[in-house]
Design a protein with these regions (language model features):
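Active-site nucleophile elbow and catalytic-triad environment of alpha/beta-hydrolase enzymes
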Residues: 41-57
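Short beta-strand/loop motif that positions the catalytic acidic residue
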Residues: 61, 67-69
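Short alpha-helix in the alpha/beta-hydrolase fold that links the catalytic acid
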Residues: 63, 76-87
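Acidic catalytic loop of the alpha/beta-hydrolase fold
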Residues: 72-76, 101
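Catalytic active-site module of serine/aspartate enzymes centered on a nucleophile-bearing elbow/loop
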Residues: 99-103, 108-140
């Protein structure tokens, strides 16, 4: 696990990179530990997505919506998912315990342990994901 000081440095680096991307600026020198999230090949994609407000987009949808949120997601917070649900009250919302951003089982918010789940293609989806998707798409 990261020490408190290292965790603070990591958080500052992430905030700084995100600020630059939100301003439409590429970040050429990304620390090695953050390359998986902010490598140069994904930065243009992230910049383009920062121009959208998910709450405004979901509010306009006239189709059924499924929101699956893991309580161990380090990229999208539970609060963010709840804001989506509030913006689209008819959405089918599920908070799934011990699930991360990749919808894999994960019982920690420790960055290193999380990254291990990101890079292991053998790990299956969380057991509830397919059940909830099947129920959602099977609704009349």
């Amino acid at each position: 696990a990261l020490s408190s000081a290292a965790s603070d440095v990591y958080k500052r680096q992430v905030r700084s990179i995100n600020t630059s991307l939100k301003e439409g600026k590429l970040v050429p020198d990304v620390p090695i530990g953050l390359q998986a999230l902010f490598r140069s090949s994904v930065q243009p994609y992230m910049i383009s997505w920062y121009t959208y407000n998910p709450q405004e987009i979901i509010k306009k949808l006239k189709v059924p919506v499924l929101i699956l949120q893991g309580d161990k997601d380090m990229q999208v917070s539970v609060k963010d998912a709840e804001l989506l649900k509030r913006s689209q009250p008819s959405a089918d919302y599920h908070l799934i315990g011990n699930m991360n951003h990749l919808m894999k089982t994960c019982d920690t918010m420790d960055q290193q342990k999380q990254m291990a789940t990101y890079t292991d293609p053998a790990l299956p989806l969380h057991k509830d994901v397919l059940i909830l998707i099947e129920k959602f798409v099977s609704k009349p």
